[in-house]
Amino acid sequence: RPAKLVSDMWAEGKSDFEIREEMVRKFKVSPDKVSLMFSVASSEQKILKDGKGKVSLYIGIPFCPTRCLYCSFTSYDMKRYNGKMDAYLDALEKEMAHCSKYYQYKKISSIYIGGGTPTSLNEQQLERLLSMVDKYYSRPQEYTVEAGRPDTITREKLRILRHHNVGRISINPQTLNQKTLDLIGR
């Protein structure tokens, strides 16, 4: 992380000139790349400053319609584990209730519900999940639900997402080539 070097040197009280000289002389970084490091470090500092007292939440739904050939994530095939999704939501609600105590005085900047494929939940389960988020956490600035598999999206699920103020969905078909989709299990 080259920009971290710049940030660390700023924290040590070094001037931009001193940092630039050290990067070129000691680390053999080209002047153009040093300028890029300063730019990235400055942007990073602003983000870190603005992020004080804020948290981002990731809520994992480890179920998918099928297990894709290439997948390295922890996910479970719905055909095999379909009966476990309600029990998973029960456990998730207990965890949300417990964790919400720690976040009650913090500003939640973003919530990302990922997976697996969260939209592999049926409509009732998706409604339950988003209602739990509403119950335990304040409304974030950014609210995303991963809908990675287009075959899991229905008009009703989109209505549920909108009702719960989800501002963005992430759709990833991987490819538009049906032969490839068949090969990888999608």
Where would I find each of the regions flagged by the language model?
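Residues at the beta-strand->loop junction immediately N-terminal to the Walker
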Residues: 58-60, 114-115
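Local cysteine-cluster metal-coordination motifs and their immediate loop/turn environment
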Residues: 60-75
